[in-house]
A protein has these predicted regions:
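A generic hydrophobic-helix recognition signal that picks specific residues
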Residues: 4, 106, 264-266
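Non-catalytic, peripheral interaction segments enriched in hydrophobic/basic residues
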Residues: 6-143, 148
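Short, hydrophobic/aliphatic alpha-helical segments
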Residues: 1-3, 99, 257-262
């Protein structure tokens, strides 16, 4: 009989070293496969204006169900291993929103209304505790649980449950948990997990200047995500505007020595300046005499304000693209390339976005 350090059993990789390293690596690979599957589905099927909503549903139904299979019973799960799973999750969220790689993590979850992987594992683990306690005391699963309670081994499943209860402020004994229904306990756990996650989002917000205007008092999708009056392209644009990752120089100061606008050269290139930039707004007749009244902060306003301002930004960005192509077409071939900072009218791209989510509408 051949000896092996790893063996797959019921979907998990069991290691002779007692770690989850091989299992987590396998789940990350499965997660990447699920992302490819979701991308394929979303590009082959015409989803129109509901592309983002359906992408988030597929994230829950396909990606999460595959990557977290059996996660409620994983032991010795480290912070690093959870972070590895969350990195894969954020790849999917960024693709769905066509978000920049520098988008603050808190924006990905706050505007989609989704819990992170750590929170989802905590819910599953605590609900599995309720399942164990609901079984007869003579059953093997219940006896193993009671035995672990008497031991003091770091990384035991019981130790992770105790940590979850402390972190989420769930002050309930096993007897208390046994005395409530599954629905009641699940409702309590979800409430506690969401409250803790919102607290974590607000803690991250305090560390990032791009999240200055982020408001997260309740974990639910931002209204613009679900509003059918906005097409997918404009929803993704509004997300970039809100998270300060639109392709303008001041959003990426570290990669631009010259902050002046490459369209007019009159002011620093900010999201707010685009609304006033003469070469970009002069051809938009409906903005004549009104640019001074435009408020960039409407991207954080109510849905009516958001629809109005994102449509204006969309038109301005189209003008910027036209200006860029006109300049390129006017450069004689013999002159060779011209550096963007040397001429007004050249638009310097500060960064490369992730692959665009292709959807009709």
């Amino acid at each position: 009989m051949m000896k092996t350090s790893d063996q797959k059993y019921l979907g998990d990789i069991m290691s002779s070293f007692g770690t989850n390293n091989s299992n987590i690596k396998e789940r990350c690979n499965i997660g990447h496969g699920a992302i490819s599957q979701i991308k394929s589905m979303m590009t082959e099927i015409s989803l129109g204006r509901f592309c983002i909503q359906i992408g988030l549903i597929l994230r829950d139904s396909i990606f999460v169900s595959k990557i977290l299979l059996n996660s409620e019973v994983w032991h010795c799960l480290t912070k690093y291993q959870v972070e590895e799973l969350e990195k894969v999750d954020r790849i999917l969220l960024r693709h769905t929103l066509n978000a920049h790689s520098k988008t603050p993590i808190e924006w990905l979850y706050a505007d989609t209304g989704k819990l992170d992987i750590k929170s989802l594992i905590q819910i599953r683990r605590l609900m599995y505790l309720w399942h164990i306690l609901s079984r007869d005391e003579g059953e093997l699963i219940h006896r193993i649980y009671q035995t672990q309670r008497l031991s003091n081994n770091v990384g035991d499943w019981v130790k992770m449950i105790e940590s979850d209860k402390r972190e989420l402020n769930i002050d309930m004994t096993d007897k208390d948990i046994q005395g409530v229904s599954k629905e009641t306990f699940k409702s309590l756990v979800k409430k506690k997990v969401k409250a803790k996650f919102i607290q974590n989002i607000n803690s991250l917000k305090a560390k990032h200047s791009k999240s200055k205007y982020l408001e997260c008092d309740d974990l639910k999708a931002a209204p613009y995500i679900e509003d059918s009056r906005l097409n997918t392209k404009n929803k993704q644009l509004l997300f970039k505007l809100r998270s300060r990752t639109l392709d303008v120089k001041k959003n990426f100061c570290g990669t631009n020595e010259n902050p002046m606008c490459t369209s007019c050269g009159l002011s620093e290139e900010t999201q707010g300046h685009l609304l006033q930039c003469p070469p970009l707004v002069k051809n938009l007749k409906y903005l004549r005499g009104k640019t001074s009244k435009l408020d960039e902060n409407h991207i954080y306003g109510d849905i009516e304000q958001q629809i109005q301002i994102v449509n204006i930004y969309s038109d301005i960005l189209e003008e910027r693209e036209k200006l860029k192509h006109q300049f390129r077409d006017n450069i004689p071939q013999s002159e060779g390339p011209v550096h963007p900072s040397h001429s007004v009218g050249v638009l310097q791209h500060t960064s490369c976005d992730n692959s665009v989510l292709v959807c009709n509408g």
